[in-house]
Amino acid sequence: MADGHIFSLFGAQLTARASGLLWWAHRRILCVSDLHLGKADRLARRSGVMSPPYEITDTLLRLEAEIDALGPAIVICLGDSFDDLAAAKSLDNVEVQWLYRLQSGRQWIWIEGNHDPGPVEFAGQHLAEFRDGPLVFRHISQKSAEAEVSGHYHPKARVQVRNRSVTRPCFLYDDKRVILPAFGTFTGGMRSDAPVLKDIMQRQAFAVLTGEACHVIPMPQE
C-alpha cells in the first residue's frame, strides 16, 4: 500500500505510514519518534563536525505534510525529539514559531527520551510515558511490556529489490509491540538483526520498510 500498512495491536487498528509515522485513525493519534531536532548543532558544538544546516527544516517539512494530510487530534513525540537539551534551545525563532503552528489546535505530548530526558521549553505535555486505551507509548521498549508503542532504536532492514540490496528505515511489529523508525534527518539506524532487537521482538515479527511506499517482510533476524 502506498500510504501505509495496516495492522492490529491489542484491538487498535494502526497504520505504519510510508513516511515513518504511526497513525491510529480511530483516536486520531499521530505518533512520531526520534526527530532529533538540532542534531547538526550538537555535532558542531561537541565535536566540531559541520553538517548541512537544513536538518530541522527538512524534518519539520515532512512532519507538517503528515499533519496537514491527516489532521490529528493528538500528536505524540516518542522521545529524542531534540538531540539534547541544549539543541532544544538552539532552534531559531522561525523554527520555534513553526513548531508552535504545528501544535496549534491539538493535544501535543512530548515523551522523554534518553537524549532529552527532561522538560523542554515548548508547549505541550511532558511525560515519561502515555497511555490511551489499550496502548502505552514510551521511548524505550520494555521486554516484559505488551500493547507497547516505542522508538529509540532507529530500526532499519534490508530487502532484495530487482537484484540489488536496499536498506530502509522500518517499523518492527509483532503481537505485543511496535517499534517506530527514526523520523529525523541524519538519524542513522540499527539493523533489525542486531542482538538487542532480536531479543525484544518475537520470531514471528514483521518489518515495514518505509520510503515512497511501504514494503512488508518478515523481520530479518540474521
Segment roles from a protein language model:
Residues 1-222:
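Extended recognition/assembly regions associated with phosphoester-bond processing machinery
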